[in-house]
Regions:
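Secondary-structure junction/capping motif
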Residues: 10, 17, 43-44, 71
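Short, compact, well-ordered microdomains
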Residues: 54-79
């Protein structure tokens, strides 16, 4: 299963699975009046969020405010 750490300026990091990360990205994309140029050609917010998850690791929401996500491996500590 893919896991991601998601970062929002001024907030604590969150660890999400792939589906949760897609929903998280969709919620941010829904706030745009107009999607950025490279996402505007996508047929849906879901397709745009999948494209972002597969090809990028950050998205500028507004000038100076960028969200980030990175794939991580979560492992149980050895005891």
């Amino acid at each position: 299963m893919d896991n991601y750490v998601v970062l929002v300026p001024g907030q604590s990091e969150q660890f999400l699975d792939r589906e949760e990360t897609l929903l998280w990205l969709q919620s941010w994309l829904n706030n745009f009046d107009e999607l950025p140029y490279d996402l505007a050609c996508k047929s849906s917010i879901l397709e745009a969020s999948q494209y972002l998850l597969d090809t990028a690791c950050d998205l500028e929401i507004k000038n100076g405010f960028t969200i980030q996500w990175y794939a991580v491996r979560l492992e149980s500590p050895d005891l």
